[in-house]
Amino acid sequence: MARNNLEKMASIDAQMRLLVPGKVSEDDKLIEYDALLLDRFLDILQDLHGEDIRAMVQECYERSGEYEGKNDPHKLEELGNVLTSLDPGDSIVVASSFSHMLNLANLAEEVQIAYRRRNKIKRGGFADESNATTESDIEETFKRLVNQLGKSPAEVFDALKNQTVDLVLTAHPTQSVRRSLLQKHARIRNCLSQLYGKDITPDEKQELDEALLREIQAAFRTDEIRRTPPTPQDEMRAGMSYFHETIWKGVPKFLRRIDTALKSIGINERVPYNAPLIQFSSWMGGDRDGNPRVTPEVTRDVCLLARMMAANLYYSQIEDLMFELSMWRCSDELRARALQLHSASKKDAKHYIEFWKQIPPNEPFRVILGDVRDKLYNTRERTRQLLSNGISDIPEEVTFTNIDEFLEPLELCYRSLCSTGDQPIADGSLLDFMRQVSTFGLSFVKLDIRQESDRHSDVADAITRHLGIGSYKEWSEEQRQAWLLSELQGKRPLFGPDLPKTDEVRDVLDTFHVISELPADNFGAYIISMATAASDVLVVELLQRECHVKKPLRVVPLFEKLADLEAAPAALARLFSINWYRNRIDGKQEVMIGYSDSGKDAGRLSAGWALYKAQEDLIKVAKEFGIKLTMFHGRGGTVGRGGGPTHLAILSQPPDTIHGSFRVTVQGEVIEQSFGEEHLCFRTLQRFTAATLEHGMRPPVAPKPEWRELMDEMAVVATKEYRSIVFQDPRFVEYFRSATPELEYGRMNIGSRPSKRKPSGGIESLRAIPWIFAWTQTRFHLPVWLGFGAAFKHVMEKDIRNLHMLQQMYNEWPFFRVTIDLIEMVFAKGDPGIAALYDKLLVSDDLWAIGEKLRANYGETKDLLLQVAGHKDLLEGDPYLKQRLRLRDSYITTLNVCQAYTLKRIRDPNYHVNLRPHLSKESSTKPAAELVKLNPTSEYAPGLEDTLILTMKGIAAGMQNTG
């Protein structure tokens, strides 16, 4: 037996080598990294659970590989029989093993990408695999603008100084990996990078290998499943951990790199420390759209917590700065201030570790910074007390209340150093610190508030009924606008404490009261989701005034559904034609466009085109009224929700729509991919900055009139096809709920938000995230491609010359190319054979025809797409991505089969399986069985629910996107 097992174990390595594509280039170490992590993991698995379990994991991997080779559905059934024969404990161990192996494969990829990137930069080439098409190296961008496009260095510098990229972190419930595991993954990445370093001694190598084993084992021994849903405060703390760990240090490093890159085009100035190049905002604890757990109290807590964290980070750095600025020479202006502060402070401060005695006047910079430190200490402690007790005994006067007070003494130090010939010192840590203060302020991030438009109408309705003038909700749009404007132009208070309030109305008003009580710099925009008309914006302006918001938030309508996008330009034109409103906004307006719900409403093709046209029309309206419009892009992580490579996504926006200000959501699962490590944070900031600059200075081509006509025609056909299936087929919802794990999605405890807007109802009430998540799990990706095939077929059958036009559009028009490339990537990740297995096991016979028809549609769409792109094979232009996907396939297939059969057992109590004897090496009462006890409340047979959740997490890791 032992000999057989050894042979079997050797065979997985051979199998891996067979399945894995060859090296793509000389510096391709992906296979090496992946094999090392896999070997280490399998050794750990064997140590913990015995040879039999290891052999079982290898057998599943091999069977999965056989399916990948031939796409034979019988192989999936054979694999299913093996997986269903496992007892509950073994089943959890196997599902968990594959989920971990996928996470390790992802880590190997990340290390490989970073390794190739460093090599390219050393050689002076472009910094990513597909060359400049997917990457925006800032120095390359500067040189391209100057050398190829004839821009002067001064023009580039001027555009750069005045542009803003605002990254808005959202707590979308799509980060399916626990933070405890993310931290271990970061350490695994680190060990792997160092193991392959050049100057490593044998002893160091052994120690790193031991550390790698330790971290892989710690990750495997950590429960992957969140046992309780996170609260909004948890989500916010998780989001803030990225600021703490990478963004805080990443911003000054990135800005320093920009200074260096500017020298390459002959600009010897630095970017001004207060240039608004990068800004950060957040929705965590502010986004109450459909999330009853985000209460006014949560919003207050989140703001105070962020302020406390900011003060703490500044405080932790100020002593380093005091050590650095030990000079005695200074300007007269600074010396006078230092003497004044010195004479006012006589006491020693024993609560400080460094510089606790009174600082002598011959260290003037330290005297100034000592005062800054005192104020930061008080700011932090006051905020801590407000957060804990609601009141503080520290007077506000001894704290920093606005950013100018904080920057003023730092600017004084900077000016003084420059005036005495010490500019190199000024441009060191002091400049970095000033850039941090300028970027993060006292509030750390600006919190956006988001609320559904209907909730504001409910409040207005309560007010008009109380005043006895009728029902706001029953009025026409004209009546609403007339009343709102007359109130906005008047002075009288609208309501007092006697206004009858439902819980919902009270919640909305209390949110405005919290906004009025907290410092104004805590907040960014007030976003109205499901906005349709001008009154949606005006009613929020009125409520801000009524609740005494001293510095009203800018009000941002969010247009999401197809019809709302089409009506958006008219709504905006109506707003801009109101004198009161134009005076209020001071020449600036922001509009948010939603990718998720428009995609769910009409399909990806029509939604993408509608978003493109809506942006063009909105910009046109803004220009007519002389208003600078900022577009806020609500993109998800998945392609179905507007995701995709940053650089391409920005460069494919319509010309003129960015103009140096770009605001975009960075959602749930994408935050880790963008900011999880320092080098990822750097790359993210670089991509956004470079692509925004390039879009403004070299706008993409505008589509030709005949391309527009073709797109219009295709969008109509695609929407019709999409809606006829998703909304009009009476049995589609039943099919969707049977064929995917949508009903079970809520068990993952990913986020604090419910997955439905309303408890009952069909696809309309389902949130976009679970809708996409469910189809991603079965690898069918229906919302992404449905409609494309019908549209292509229609225009090609109408006139075969249209194929040539589509190919021309693909080659010349960035928007169209990005759309097609992203769909192609999704097809490369998809597998209709897997979706067919779900149908066979979970869907009743009378609904099979729906699935068969959709799979035929999938195949036809894929073939037409390849014709349009002029490709023989999927991803033929991106061998690296092709290699990475092939590496993951066998893991994902095992998890898919395990998921489909587990769903069958959960949903059909009469489904019979033959269990084999327990495999785990300890007795049947030991570890594997203990795993079952982690979930004591499950309503299903032991182990099934956890096995299911582990497969969901594993597949999400393998597809590299959740919802």
Swiss-Prot record:
Function: Through the carboxylation of phosphoenolpyruvate (PEP) it forms oxaloacetate, a four-carbon dicarboxylic acid source for the tricarboxylic acid cycle.
Protein known as: Phosphoenolpyruvate carboxylase
Enzyme Commission identifier(s): 4.1.1.31
Residues annotated as the enzyme's active site: 172, 600
Catalyzed chemical reaction(s): oxaloacetate + phosphate = phosphoenolpyruvate + hydrogencarbonate
Enzyme class: lyase
Phosphoserine modifications at: 11
Swiss-Prot/TrEMBL cofactor(s): Mg(2+)
HAMAP family linked: PEPcase_type1
Gene: PPC
Molecular-function annotations in GO: phosphoenolpyruvate carboxylase activity
Organism this protein belongs to: Picea abies
Single biological process term from Gene Ontology: tricarboxylic acid cycle
Family stated for the protein in its record: Belongs to the PEPCase type 1 family.
Quaternary structure, from the entry: Homotetramer.
Keyword annotations: Allosteric enzyme, Carbon dioxide fixation, Cytoplasm, Lyase, Magnesium, Phosphoprotein, Photosynthesis
Any GO CC annotation of this UniProt entry: chloroplast
Free-text activity regulation comment from the record: By light-reversible phosphorylation.
PROSITE patterns: PEPCASE_1 (PS00781), PEPCASE_2 (PS00393)
Matching InterPro entries: PEP_COase (IPR021135), PEP_COase_bac/pln-type (IPR022805), PEP_COase_Lys_AS (IPR018129), PEPCASE_His_AS (IPR033129), Pyrv/PenolPyrv_kinase-like_dom (IPR015813)
Annotated localization: Cytoplasm
